[in-house]
Amino acid sequence: MSRQLNMDTLRQNFWKEEYLKEMMLRYEWQRKYGTLVKAKQKAKAASRLPRKLPTLLPQASVAPPPPASKTTPSKAPSPAPEPLFLSDMYPVAPNTKALLYEGISHDLQGRYQYLNTRKLDLPETRYLFPITTNFTYGWQLGPPTKQELVSCKMCRIESFFRKNGAFALLDPRDLAL
């Protein structure tokens, strides 16, 4: 049994046009982004190559510098070097940090107790600035409000279900505006 090929001139022209559109799209993409892709590939290939250490040539002995005269004024002491790693968080209080070294996490001490204590602090007091957009949203919420539950079950049932039936016309008071 042979397969039927439903190709008439109209369908054949359609597929030819689709093929040409795809080819033009690929060509345009290649023209637009081809150089960027090649540059990235070259950079990646260059990073994979092993780096060679420079060869050091023996140098002639250099005379030591002349001793500084005692009459020259001494330089002012340089300021303290800045720390290499700047943290996003405020420093931890010493008593909270001491929790790390007391016991082990298995006994709900040590790191476990330290993390739970840190979790109790508000993000505003832990971080210098909002790290993510969720922080910004959360910092604007404020303290949570307590919602009181209705004590009787019938009050909840009567307020939850519609009083006038499922298919009855809606009461104007039932619509949320």
Curated annotation (Swiss-Prot):
It comes from the Eukaryota. Pfam families: SPMIP1. InterPro entries: SPMIP1_C. Residues 47-80 are annotated as: Disordered. PANTHER family: PROTEIN ATP6V1FNB (PTHR35826:SF2), PROTEIN ATP6V1FNB-LIKE (PTHR35826). This is Protein SPMIP1. It comes from Mus musculus.
